[in-house]
């Protein structure tokens, strides 16, 4: 309607009633106010992205750095990436075990509390399968995310395509680099399309 009034003024040289001008200005102000409210809500309610998987490289930091350049409001979470802390937390907090099974069992139990909560709160779950190790925990967390109907983005090299075909099929995107993951997240959250 605003465009129609402006079209009449400029094309036909017609006059416009002062109430129509007031109406146009009020609509513009309302549209701007709605946009400001949406932007403020977007900034106050960042998306939660859980970064799961391989802990032997800086892929998490690479994703965070790229997304920082996009200025995308995101709150990141991740499992405990300190390998020894993750392995030994149960024995440190609940008492040591002589049997390695029970040592691992205690640690896994404590880690599951953190994992479950963070995945439940996530809007997007990114799972990285690295080159060197068989990441059973990463596959497990991908399964949890899928069961909870979370948006799942996988990050792995082509050499794992066949082994991960079932997990790939259940994901929303399969990426080959941290930069690709960041670009996908930026597009999904803000509609930013950069190559």
Which residue stretches match the model-derived regions?
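Short, positively charged and aromatic/hydrophobic N-terminal segments
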Residues: 15, 24-27
